[in-house]
Amino acid sequence: MEIAVEREEENYLELRIQGEDHTLGNLIAGRLRSVKGVILATYYLPHPLKDELVIKIKTDGTISPREALNRAIEDVKVLGESFLDELEQV
């Protein structure tokens, strides 16, 4: 996985991630939408034959896009740990 900042402003962040597809894009964008202060969280694949995605994050100014991304990633980590804990109970 290789991550590059395509565009960054005070309330906007656009990342290009090499080697990933809808799986990561949907997971991160979905979690970002639940972070308070995020007004846009989306992703797209620039080309269907390349493993590459672009994530766009826009906030209302109460939180930075990078902080929102960090919170979303933490949520994903907690979700994964919870899933593993539940799986061990089965």
Curated annotation (Swiss-Prot):
Purpose of the protein: DNA-dependent RNA polymerase (RNAP) catalyzes the transcription of DNA into RNA using the four ribonucleoside triphosphates as substrates.
Q: Which InterPro entries match?
A: RBP11-like, RBP11-like_dimer, RNA_pol_Rpb11_13-16kDa_CS, Rpo11-like
Q: What is its main location?
A: cytoplasm
Name a single GO cellular component: DNA-directed RNA polymerase complex
Q: What is this protein's name?
A: DNA-directed RNA polymerase subunit Rpo11
Matches recorded under PROSITE patterns? RNA_POL_L_13KD (PS01154)
Q: What is the similarity comment for this entry?
A: Belongs to the archaeal Rpo11/eukaryotic RPB11/RPC19 RNA polymerase subunit family.
- Gene Ontology BP, a term: DNA-templated transcription
Organism the protein comes from: Metallosphaera sedula (strain ATCC 51363 / DSM 5348 / JCM 9185 / NBRC 15509 / TH2)
Please indicate if the UniProt record lists Cytoplasm as a keyword. Answer: yes
